[in-house]
Each structure stands twice: as C-alpha cells, then as structure tokens.
Amino acid sequence: MTPELNLKSLGAKTPYIFEYNSQLLEAFPNPNPNLDPLITLECKEFTSLCPITSQPDFGVIFIRYIPKDKMVESKSLKLYLFSYRNHGSFHESCINTILLDLVRLLEPKYLEVYGDFASRGGIAIKPFVNYAIKEYQDFKEKRLLNAK
C-alpha cells in the first residue's frame, strides 16, 4: 500500500494558471534519502515575457538536483513553470527565482537551474545558477566551472 502523499495536482483536473505562482509547487518524501541520485528535469517549452517589450521569450529549462528528504512532484513543476507564461521577467531573474523557489520547497543537498533561451537579436542568453549545502560545496564549484 502506498503512503498518503497529500498531492493536489497529480490525478486531478488541471486548471492552467499563466501568472507566476510558486504555491503550485509540491513535494513528496524521498523514498531513498540515503542515496545521492543526480536527478535531471527538462522543460522544453518554457515561456515568459520580456519585461520591457512584452514580447514572448522561449527557452528550455534544465533543473538538476540531489534530493535530501523531499523530491519535487513533476506535474506541479510543470504547472509552476507554465505559470511564467504571462510573467514579465528577464531570463536571469526567471532562473534565479526558479532556483530559490525549489530550494525553499525541497531543501536539497544540491540544485542547479540552467536556461537555454532562444536567440533574440542574434544573441542567446544561457543563465546558470546553483546551490549546495555545506557538504556539497566542492561539487557546486565543479559544476559551476563546467556549466553549459
């Protein structure tokens, strides 16, 4: 028998919200907290708005993390990332906010967010940000040096 996870999004009718909302994120207990898997999540259809021109920006968001006690529920992550659709923010700010929201929710051992945004005016912006608890600082520094 599976434990009660108290998830609101998974298996329910999906109301799509297109205004930034960190409350959409949900987590569940890590079933193997003694292991250190590096989990990769990829959102191939991330969209937000330029805060100056209100033009849409498109990108691929890569989230990698080593969980501690909690893991992100993937449908809630999808809904959360969709909530940026009409949100006006620079690429770098989006990536920083995603990291901060996930760190607040999960309290992971390690987490990184990388955005591969479509070129605009011939320039592609590819922000990277990462976080680590004290025991994973060396890993964080190595990942930062080898960021895409």
UniProtKB/Swiss-Prot annotation:
Q: Which InterPro entries match?
A: GTP-CH-I_C/QueF, NADPH_dep_7-cyano-7-deazaG_red, QueF, QueF_type1
- Answer whether the UniProt record assigns the keyword Glycosyltransferase to this protein: no
Q: This protein's superkingdom?
A: Bacteria
User: Which residues are annotated as active site?
Assistant: C50, D57
This entry's Enzyme Commission designation comes to 1.7.1.13
Catalyzed reactions: 7-aminomethyl-7-carbaguanine + 2 NADP(+) = 7-cyano-7-deazaguanine + 2 NADPH + 3 H(+)
Which EC class does it fall in?
oxidoreductase
Keywords for this protein: Cytoplasm, NADP, Oxidoreductase, Queuosine biosynthesis
Protein role: Catalyzes the NADPH-dependent reduction of 7-cyano-7-deazaguanine (preQ0) to 7-aminomethyl-7-deazaguanine (preQ1).
Report the PANTHER family cross-referenced here: NADPH-DEPENDENT 7-CYANO-7-DEAZAGUANINE REDUCTASE
UniProt protein name: NADPH-dependent 7-cyano-7-deazaguanine reductase
